[in-house]
UniProtKB/Swiss-Prot annotation:
It comes from Deinococcus radiodurans (strain ATCC 13939 / DSM 20539 / JCM 16871 / CCUG 27074 / LMG 4051 / NBRC 15346 / NCIMB 9279 / VKM B-1422 / R1). Residues 11-202 form the Lon N-terminal domain. It is an enzyme of class 3 (hydrolase). Keywords: ATP-binding, Cytoplasm, Hydrolase, Nucleotide-binding, Protease, Serine protease, Stress response. SMART domains: AAA, LON. Induction: By heat shock. ATP binds at residues 367-374. The keyword Cytoplasm applies. Residues 603-785 form the Lon proteolytic domain. This is Lon protease. It is found in: Cytoplasm. The keyword Protease applies. One of its GO terms (cellular component) is cytoplasm. It comes from the Bacteria.
Length: 821
C-alpha cells in the first residue's frame, strides 16, 4: 500500500459526519449512503486509497464539494465487509494530512490532493510546548473524561505530534476545533491550538466539579431535612397521645403546597406558615388561624386555567341565541374577542410575549336596568369556555371588600376578588363587577381606589390581598363592569375602562324579546305547556305600553309571569284547559292599566310648548306652560319641582325674550308690569337638566306674543343668552318617547344630527327632524307662522291670550321619577 510520499494525485472521497481521523490511526467507518459506498468500491478496485474528509454540515445527506472541508486524511483501506442490509463497514489506516485542490462529482466524489507541508518545527519552544501539553493532559485526564486504556496509549507515544493527534481525537471537542487540529500540519502550531483547547476543557471541568459539589450538598441537605422531619413527626405523635391525623396535618399542607407550582418567593412565605403550624400545639388559638389561612391558599387555582375558545363565529351565535338586538354591543364584544384571538396566535408563534395576550381594555357596560348588561357578560363567558363569577359591588363601602382583611383581625377573610377566584376554580375566569357606579366610601377606605390596582393591566399581575399577604396574578382574568350611571364612577377608575353603552329597548324589541325569551321561560317556570296558553301580539303590546314603564324587560317578565300563574291556577282547578290572552282580557288578569302614555296636544295653544326628557326607564314628552299675569311687575315664578339647572334655563329664556322684545314686537311695558308664571307638569316629579331651554323659550315667547306653539312639534336642546342652540344627550330615548306620544316633528341641536342614525330606521322614516343651530331657527319651526309671524307687527286683535288651562285637549300621564330634560 502506498505511504504518504507515494499517494495518488486523485483518489475517491468518503465523506463522514461529525468526526475527524488523524494520521497513524486505525478506524472503522460505516457507509450507508450511495455516494460513500460507490467511493469505497472504487478504492477497492484501484489502489485501495481513499480520502476521509468531514462535512461542514452533518445534516446534509447528499454532499457536494462545497459541503466538505478542504483538508482531509488519506487512508489505506485495510478491509471492507458488506452487511446484510447493503451497507459497508470499512477498516482504514490513516496515512497523511492532505490538501484538496478540487473536488469532482460523478457516481461518487473524487479529489485532487497533495500532502500538506509540515514546515520546520523543533528546538526549545517545541520542548516547552511538549512538557506543557503533557502536564495539562494529565490534569484533564484525571477528571475521568478519558478511559485509562486510552490514557496509557497516548502517554506511550514518543512522537509529540502523533500524541497531540490522539489527544484531540479522544477529547470531546467541537468538530470545528478537531478540524483545526487536522489542518495544523506544523507541530508547533498544532500544540499551541491544542493547549488553548485544553485550557478551556480545564475550566469546563472545574465548573462541572463545582456543580456536582452543589448538587451533592443539596441532596445531603434534603436528606437531613427529611430525617429531622420524620423525627419531628414521631415526637409530635407521642406528645399528642398517638393522634396520627394531627401529626400529619402540616405534612398534608406541605404536600398540597408543593403540588401548586408556586413561585419561590410565594412558596417561601407560605412554607413559613406551615412550619409555624408544625411547631404549634393543635389546640392553640393561633393554630386555627394558620389552618384557615393555609386552607385558603391551597384551594386557590394558582396555575389552573380554562382553555379559551376564541371562535368569533361561535361567539356571535351564542350572543344571538341569548340576546335580541343590541347589535352595536355585540359587534364591540366580537371585536374584543377577535383581537384577543389574534394576540394569542401571535404569542404561539413567538412574535409577542404571553403577557401581551391578556392586555386590553376593561369593558364597562352602562345603561338602564334590565337591558341585558349582566346576561351578556354570562354569554361572553359561555362563548369563551371560561368560568363566570359575579361580584355585586352595590353598597360596598370598605376597602377590605376588595383587598380583604389582615389576619390580625378576628374573622378575617380575603376580599371579594380572591373569593371569586376560588369560587371559579381557575385563574382566568370572567369576573363581572356589577353596579360599579354604586360603590360607597367611608372612614375605612374607598373600595373604588382599591379597584384601581385590580383593573390596571400593568399592576394586577402582582395583586396582593391583605389576607393572603402574597401576590396573586390577576392578569389572565377578564374583568367586565356594569353601571347604570357612568358619571358616578370615579374618574381614575373610569379612565381604566372602555364604555359600551346599552340603550333602552324600543317597543318592537321588547315585543320580540317577550316572544322569544320571556314567554318560554315563564311557561317553563309555571309548569305550563305552549299549547295551554298563548298571548296575542296586541296583548303583549298593551302589556309593554300600559302595564310596564321601563327601559329593560324585567317588569314585563314579571307581568307575563303573573298572567301565567293565574292561568296555571285556572287549569289546575279545572276551570279551563287552555287560555288565549288578548289585549281586551288583560284587565281580567292584571287589573286597570297602571300607566297611561303621555299624548300630544290636540290643538295648537298659546304659551304651551312640548319638550322631551328621559329617565333610566326611557323617554317621554313634557309640557312647558307659561301664563302672563298683569298688575304685578317683573317677576318670574317657576313651579313643577324644577332643579337648579332647569330654573336657570327659564331665566335665560326670559332674558333672551327681553333682549329681542323689539324684534319680536313684545310690549315692553306689559312685560315689565306683568308676572310670568312657568309651570312644568307633573308637579310631583323632580325635573332637572339643561335641554329644556328651547321649550322654555318657545313657551315664554308664545305667551308674550300671543302666537300659538305647534302641538305636533317636540323639542330638546340647551339655549344660550346669545341664542345659540347647544347639543344634549339621550336623543334616542327622547325621540322614542315622543313617537309613542304621537309627535311627528322633532327639533334638535344641529350638533346632535349625527345621533339620528342611532334611531331605528322604521321610526326615522315616520318622523321629520329639524336640526337647529339658533333659537331663532327653533322658533321658526315651533311657532305657528314661524319667525315671520314673530317679526311682523301685530295689533291687539291679532294677539291670542294664553290659555287658562294648559291641559286642554290632552291627558297627563304618570312619569317615572328623576326626569331629566
Amino acid at each position: 500500500m502506498p505511504d504518504s510520499t507515494a499517494l495518488p494525485t486523485t483518489i475517491p472521497v468518503c465523506p463522514v459526519r461529525g468526526s475527524v481521523i488523524y494520521p497513524t490511526m486505525v478506524q472503522h467507518i460505516d457507509a450507508s449512503r450511495a455516494i460513500s459506498i460507490n467511493a469505497i468500491e472504487a478504492a477497492m478496485s484501484g489502489e485501495k486509497v481513499i480520502l476521509i474528509v468531514s462535512q461542514r454540515d452533518k445534516d446534509v445527506d447528499d454532499p457536494k464539494g462545497e459541503d466538505l472541508y478542504d483538508v482531509g486524511t488519506a487512508c489505506n483501506v485495510l478491509r471492507v465487509r458488506k452487511n446484510p442490509d447493503g451497507t459497508l463497514q470499512m477498516l482504514v489506516s490513516a496515512v497523511a494530512r492532505v490538501q484538496v485542490s478540487a473536488y469532482q462529482l460523478g457516481d461518487y466524489l473524487t479529489a485532487d490532493i497533495e500532502p500538506l507541508d509540515a514546515g520546520k518545527s523543533g528546538g526549545v519552544e517545541l520542548q516547552a510546548l511538549s512538557r506543557e501539553l503533557k502536564d495539562k493532559f494529565e490534569t484533564v485526564a484525571s477528571g475521568g473524561r478519558i478511559n485509562a486504556e486510552s490514557v496509557q496509549t497516548i502517554n506511550s507515544k514518543d512522537d509529540i505530534g502523533e500524541m497531540a493527534d490522539h489527544i484531540a481525537f479522544n477529547l470531546d471537542f467541537k468538530l470545528e476545533d478537531k478540524q483545526a487540529i487536522l489542518e495544523a500540519a506544523n507541530v508547533t502550531e498544532r500544540l499551541k491550538k491544542l493547549l488553548t483547547l485544553l485550557d478551556t476543557e480545564q475550566e469546563v471541568q472545574a465548573v462541572q466539579a463545582k456543580i456536582r459539589a452543589q448538587v451533592k450538598e443539596e441532596i445531603d441537605k434534603n436528606q437531613r431535612e427529611y430525617y429531622l422531619r420524620e423525627q419531628m413527626k414521631v415526637i409530635q405523635k407521642e406528645l399528642q397521645g398517638g393522634d396520627e391525623e394531627e401529626g400529619d396535618e402540616a405534612e398534608a399542607f406541605r404536600a398540597k403546597i408543593d403540588a401548586l407550582g408556586l413561585n419561590p418567593e410565594v412558596k417561601k412565605e407560605i412554607d413559613r406558615e406551615v412550619n409555624r403550624l408544625a411547631r404549634m400545639h393543635p389546640d392553640a388559638a393561633e393554630a386555627s388561624v394558620i389552618r384557615t389561612y393555609l386552607t385558603w391558599v391551597t384551594e386557590l387555582p394558582w396555575n389552573e386555567r380554562s382553555d379559551d375558545r376564541l371562535d368569533v363565529e361561535e361567539a356571535a351565535q351564542v350572543l344571538d341565541e341569548d340576546h335580541y338586538g343590541l347589535e352595536k354591543v355585540k359587534d364591540r364584544v366580537l371585536e374584543f374577542l377577535a383581537v384577543r384571538r389574534l394576540r394569542k396566535e401571535r404569542a404561539e408563534r413567538g412574535e409577542i410575549s404571553a403577557e401581551e395576550v391578556n392586555k386590553g381594555p376593561i369593558l364597562v357596560f352602562t345603561g338602564p336596568p334590565g337591558v341585558g348588561k349582566t346576561s351578556i357578560a354570562q354569554s361572553i363567558a359561555k362563548s369563551l369556555g371560561r368560568k363566570y363569577v359575579r361580584i355585586a359591588l352595590g353598597g360596598a363601602r370598605d376597602e377590605s371588600d376588595i383587598r380583604g382583611h389582615r389576619r390580625t383581625y378576628i374573622g378575617a377573610m380575603p376580599g371579594r376578588i380572591i373569593q371569586g377566584i376560588r369560587t371559579a376554580g381557575t385563574k382566568n375566569p370572567v369576573i363581572l363587577l356589577d353596579e360599579v357606579d354604586k360603590l360607597g366610601s367611608s372612614y375605612q377606605g374607598d373600595p373604588s381606589s382599591a379597584l384601581l390596582e385590580v383593573l390596571d393591566p400593568s399592576q394586577n399581575q402582582h395583586f396582593t390581598d391583605h389576607y393572603l399577604g402574597v401576590p396573586f396574578d390577576l392578569s389572565e382574568v377578564m374583568f367586565i363592569a356594569t353601571a347604570n350611571y357612568p358619571e358616578q364612577i370615579p374618574a381614575a377608575l373610569m379612565d381604566r375602562m372602555e364604555v359600551i353603552e346599552f340603550n333602552s329597548y324600543i317597543e318592537q324589541e321588547k315585543l320580540e324579546i317577550a316572544k322569544r325569551y320571556l314567554l318560554p321561560r315563564q311557561l317553563l317556570q309555571n309548569g305550563l305547556k305552549p299549547n295551554q296558553i298563548s298571548f296575542s301580539d296586541a296583548a303583549l303590546e298593551k302589556l309593554i305600553s300600559h302595564y310596564t314603564r321601563e327601559a329593560g324587560v324585567r317588569n314585563l317578565e314579571r307581568e307575563i309571569g303573573t298572567v301565567a300563574r293565574k292561568v296555571a291556577r285556572n287549569i289546575a282547578t279545572g276551570k279551563t284547559k287552555r287560555a288565549k290572552v288578548t289585549d281586551k282580557e288583560l284587565e281580567k288578569y292584571l287589573g286597570q292599566p297602571r300607566h297611561t302614555p303621555e299624548t300630544e296636544n290636540m290643538e295648537d295653544m298659546v304659551g304651551v310648548s312640548t319638550g322631551m326628557f328621559y329617565t333610566p326607564v326611557g323617554g317621554d314628552i313634557l309640557f312647558v306652560e307659561t301664563s302672563i299675569m298683569t298688575g304685578k311687575g317683573g317677576g318670574l315664578l317657576l313651579t313643577g319641582q324644577l332643579g337648579d339647572v332647569m330654573k336657570e334655563s327659564a331665566r335665560a329664556a326670559l332674558t333672551y325674550a327681553k333682549s329681542n322684545a323689539e324684534r319680536f314686537h313684545i310690549d315692553r311695558e306689559k312685560l315689565d308690569n306683568s308676572e310670568i308664571h312657568v309651570h312644568v307638569p307633573a308637579g310631583a316629579i323632580p325635573k332637572e337638566g339643561p335641554s329644556a331651554g328651547g321649550a322654555m323659550a318657545t313657551s315664554l315667547i308664545s305667551a308674550l306674543t300671543g302666537i300659538p306653539a305647534r302641538h305636533d312639534v317636540a323639542m330638546t336642546g340647551e339655549m344660550t343668552l346669545t341664542g345659540r342652540y347647544l347639543p344634549i344627550g339621550g336623543l334616542k330615548e327622547k325621540v322614542l318617547g315622543a313617537r309613542r306620544a304621537g309627535i311627528k316633528h322633532i327639533i334638535l341641536p344641529k350638533a346632535n344630527e349625527r345621533d339620528i342614525n342611532d334611531i331605528p330606521l322604521h321610526l326615522r322614516s315616520s318622523m321629520r327632524f329639524h336640526p337647529c343651530e339658533t333659537v331663532d331657527q327653533v322658533l321658526d319651526v315651533a311657532l305657528v307662522g314661524g319667525l315671520k309671524a314673530l317679526e311682523t307687527p301685530r295689533t291687539d286683535s291679532q294677539v291670542t291670550p294664553p290659555a287658562d288651562s294648559g291641559s286642554k285637549g290632552r291627558k297627563t300621564g304618570r312619569r317615572s321619577p328623576e326626569a331629566r330634560a
